């Protein structure tokens, strides 16, 4: 059974909704999932997890949130080599179907750090995740559990 830390930052609650759906899917898929806001995760427990799902909504000009999430992610980035990592987040700045540059950049950043990025891409949702987007997040979590 994989032990997965799901760590997120959410300014509006939309990425938190995604995180909760992913945790539900992970548990259905047979993983042991722990959910943390980025400020509540103890970096000292990093090595006790097999896999990580990181969530951050797009901020500014299609980038990771800079005051809480970016410093956290920078602090653990050097430890991602060989780790199975899933990425997710919501966006609002671009129109539906037009966003995602921050996720593409984040995926490439994780790959450059040596992470095994799940499915080679992140799970994104526009604005407040619809029922369809929430179902997609649950399925994403279930697949990541395997």
Swiss-Prot record:
Keyword Flavoprotein tagged: yes
Every Flavodoxin-like domain range: 4-145
Key words of the record: Electron transport, Flavoprotein, FMN, Transport
Keyword Lyase: no
CC cofactor: FMN
PROSITE patterns linked to this entry: FLAVODOXIN (PS00201), FLAVODOXIN_LIKE (PS50902)
Superkingdom of this protein's organism: Bacteria
Stored InterPro entries: Flav_short (IPR010087), Flavodoxin/NO_synth (IPR008254), Flavodoxin_CS (IPR001226), Flavoprotein-like_sf (IPR029039)
GO molecular function, one term: electron transfer activity
Family: Belongs to the flavodoxin family.
Function noted in UniProt: Low-potential electron donor to a number of redox enzymes.
Protein name as annotated: Flavodoxin
Organism of derivation: Treponema pallidum (strain Nichols)
